[in-house]
Amino acid sequence: MRRRFSALAVVLAVVLAVAGCTMRGRRQGPSRPPSLGVSSAPTTTAGTARATLARPGAGSTRGLPGMPAVPDPGDVYAAARPGRLSPVVRGFPARVYVPNSRDDTVDVLDPRTFRRLARFRVGRQPQHVTPSWDLRTLWVGNNQGNSLTAIDPATGRRGRTVPVADPYNLYFTPDGRRAIVVAERLRRLDFHDPHTMRLRHSLPVPCFGVNHLDFSADGRSLLASCEFSGHLVWVDVAAERVTGLLRLRAGAMPQDVKLAPDGRVYYVADMGSGGVWIIDAARPRVLGFLPTGRGAHGLYVSRDDRYLYVSNRGEGSISLVSFATRKVVATWRIPGGGSPDMGGISADGGVLWLTGRYNGEVYALDTGGGRLLARIPVGRGPHGLCVYPQPGRYSLGHTGVLR
């Protein structure tokens, strides 16, 4: 079991100073975690969030320089609706790529027949399969192998492997300028060249277990979750520096992060609390908490932008949260139980794909009502599968967050 950290106070000012010093070479060993002690820094706690934060710009009309223009200011996912495939991906065969973290393999599934087409070896402990910002490459994050393995989505074949430290997760800045390797074990966000994957800057974070994140509507800031200390941390994307920190309640284990279509709030899955936090996108403030189920883990936006699908890994269910009402409106239970973890949605929006982390299987569910369409055996420890291709102009990373 991963170690939980009790209530921590963080000297954020020290971290900000450290974060300002860029590191131009690749680090060879683990960085020391930020100093822990009594702090008067802007660390806020859920329910008492009063400290200020460099505003993420949720309502800003100016996007991050170089970021593609938002086609609909009221819907950050407007370009990812059904059928809106980029010309880059239109010729790619529809596939589901499943990283098996305990077998060091990737399974390639046919989403029409629900059959496995191929299996190939990658590095040690693959965690997620991530589309590149330009949509041309899929990257497998080999966490313990300290490497990324490329997949050509035009052929479904394995490509080159490049050395990268501790790639638990992978994201891309909205302007495509940097790849962000989420180095959970090393407690930092590493900013890389998105093509060569050469390290450009390491940013230590003032919390433990950083593993998921999402970006504001204007692309100027990101919100990352820290599972082991129960924190959320804000980062200025252009400056690559920490700007704020929020402590959730005791026992919180925040996981996946997803921006609402209107860009006003973030939803944060909390495995420890069995639900989803609603976080103000403009300041470090908790707006609410929605109980969904044991082990709330992955978050996925429906193609029509009406619902947020929440995978409850501990009880084998999926909850639907209405973006309009910010309430849970339905719960689907996997027949016979399961351990739904990470995944994605088909290009037409009709099927929700999730891995069964502790059951060695993949679930395909009809989004029209939650009916289980298929239960597909895969390798051991399947984790962040990627459904590909998907609609959208560019990828922010993870298992396929496109805008």
Predicted features by range, described:
Residues 1-18:
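Sec-dependent bacterial lipoprotein signal peptides
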Residues 16, 21-403:
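Predominantly soluble domains enriched in secretory-pathway, periplasmic, or organellar proteins
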